[in-house]
């Protein structure tokens, strides 16, 4: 009987051991599954964070590019402002300059009038020198080809000695500041 008892005990031990092994395997499978789920969740979180990082980096690069563009635009505006700073003053002085030219076109035999005209001519020349220092130039007209960018045709002429579209007379001087027209020349153009 003791042999039977031993056999039963051994069988019970084996069954118990097998049950324990099955339980251990089940626990390991559950742990592996939980670990796999955790890894999958962690990987998903990592991907999400990487995507957010990429998005933030892209926004940063765009903002940096926008800042550089604003900086360049500001520099260009400042340069243009500096370049054309005297335009408003020149526009205000042009009517006075025209009046000087009309006054200087008069002639007189009186010595006093000649002296006054000489003084006016000196002032006129000083204004032209100041204009030149600022980059303000007279737009060439008589003998030039008509250019609507620089000239305003107010009359037509039929001169056989002049070419087609050639300016035959200047009625009012035009001026430009560097590359910008302040006032176009008013001209008479040959047909």
Swiss-Prot record:
Keywords: Chaperone, Cytoplasm, Stress response. One of its GO terms (biological process) is protein folding. It is found in: Cytoplasm. GO terms for cellular component: cytoplasm. GO terms for molecular function: adenyl-nucleotide exchange factor activity; protein homodimerization activity; protein-folding chaperone binding; unfolded protein binding. Transmembrane segments: none annotated. It holds the Pfam family GrpE. It comes from the Bacteria. Coiled coil: none annotated. Participates actively in the response to hyperosmotic and heat shock by preventing the aggregation of stress-denatured proteins, in association with DnaK and GrpE. It is the nucleotide exchange factor for DnaK and may function as a thermosensor. Unfolded proteins bind initially to DnaJ; upon interaction with the DnaJ-bound protein, DnaK hydrolyzes its bound ATP, resulting in the formation of a stable complex. GrpE releases ADP from DnaK; ATP binding to DnaK triggers the release of the substrate protein, thus completing the reaction cycle. HAMAP family: GrpE. Homodimer. This is Protein GrpE. It comes from Listeria monocytogenes serovar 1/2a (strain ATCC BAA-679 / EGD-e). The gene is grpE.
């Amino acid at each position: 009987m003791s042999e039977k008892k031993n056999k039963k005990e051994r069988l019970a031990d084996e069954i118990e051991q097998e049950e324990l092994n099955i339980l251990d395997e089940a626990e390991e499978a559950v742990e592996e599954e939980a670990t796999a789920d955790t890894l999958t969740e962690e990987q998903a979180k990592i991907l999400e964070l990487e995507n957010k990082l990429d998005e933030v980096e892209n926004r940063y690069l765009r903002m940096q590019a926008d800042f550089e563009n604003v900086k360049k635009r500001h520099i260009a505006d400042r340069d243009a402002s500096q370049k054309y700073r005297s335009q408003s003053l020149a526009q205000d002085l042009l009517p006075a300059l025209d009046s000087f030219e009309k006054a200087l076109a008069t002639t007189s035999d009186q010595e006093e009038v000649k002296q006054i005209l000489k003084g006016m001519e000196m002032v006129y020349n000083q204004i032209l020198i100041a204009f030149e220092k600022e980059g303000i130039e007279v737009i060439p007209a008589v003998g030039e080809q008509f250019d609507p960018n620089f000239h305003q045709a107010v009359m037509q002429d039929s001169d056989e000695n002049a070419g087609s579209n050639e300016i035959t007379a200047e009625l009012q001087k035009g001026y430009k500041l560097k590359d910008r027209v302040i006032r176009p020349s008013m001209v008479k153009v040959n047909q």
